[in-house]
């Protein structure tokens, strides 16, 4: 079984208990405007250009079989539409420019790998997981966008008696989610917005399937040992007001009786530079990072609703 990942991040401390390895799968049905990993959205491998590394050797232009790279007045110009048509579908000569870029200014985002190769990588830290109470966290992208690959990773990890976690927006068929649950110890559920129109505006999809899956996970928790935490990224001018968080807390209390932990994650700017690298435009350039006082103000809503402020 093979899938496409774009990173394995070892020694993570923020996506579950203990010390963990985060496995980032490519592909996501959402297109959140603030996404910090835009290279995770496309399910295929894609080209990234790091301008600061380019030495101007012109090898990429000579070796591109599809004419996607040309020389502008000051820098390379990449027609990513041509790349998507020919290279992202991995036709003959796909990403030949990368092979000729000795300065490593051109890179392929994503790599095809097997379950066995993933396990070989994460098992390097097996003793650390056991001593720290850690394990693996499968994230992305959206893990359920590669359901069979995800299932096999989780199954192989549980066979080694290693703790497993998933970070998911839950935009997937329930049957797909349910199949994986016997091999999952911990789930982070992303709850971005309650209002359906707002959710569609900022993520590109309705949230109705997501909300239904949250309810089903709460029901599942009644009879199964599994930790579930709701997570909301706090995005200025989108969901950073008291009323929005108040309504989300109300909904959690009313619809997710088995789930008590809720975590608010402050917006950060770490992913902004990635957009230009893959030929995309970052739409939320004016956003400021939420202040500590703003985050505490919003967290008070969690406590007032009798929920637990989660910290991971």
Task: Please provide the spans of the model-predicted regions.
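Short glycine-enriched, charge-decorated loop/helix-capping segments at active-site entrances
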Residues: 49, 200-206, 279-287
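Conserved AdoMet/S-adenosylmethionine-binding subsite of the radical SAM
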Residues: 116-270, 276
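Auxiliary Fe-S-binding modules of radical SAM enzymes
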Residues: 2-17, 222-223, 234-312
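Conserved active-site and cofactor/substrate-binding residues in soluble primary-metabolism enzymes
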Residues: 27, 55, 113, 243, ...
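Flexible, acidic/Gly-rich N-terminal and inter-domain linker regions that tether
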Residues: 1-62, 66, 71
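ABC-type ATPase nucleotide-binding domain
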Residues: 35, 104, 190
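Conserved Radical SAM active-site core
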Residues: 43-183
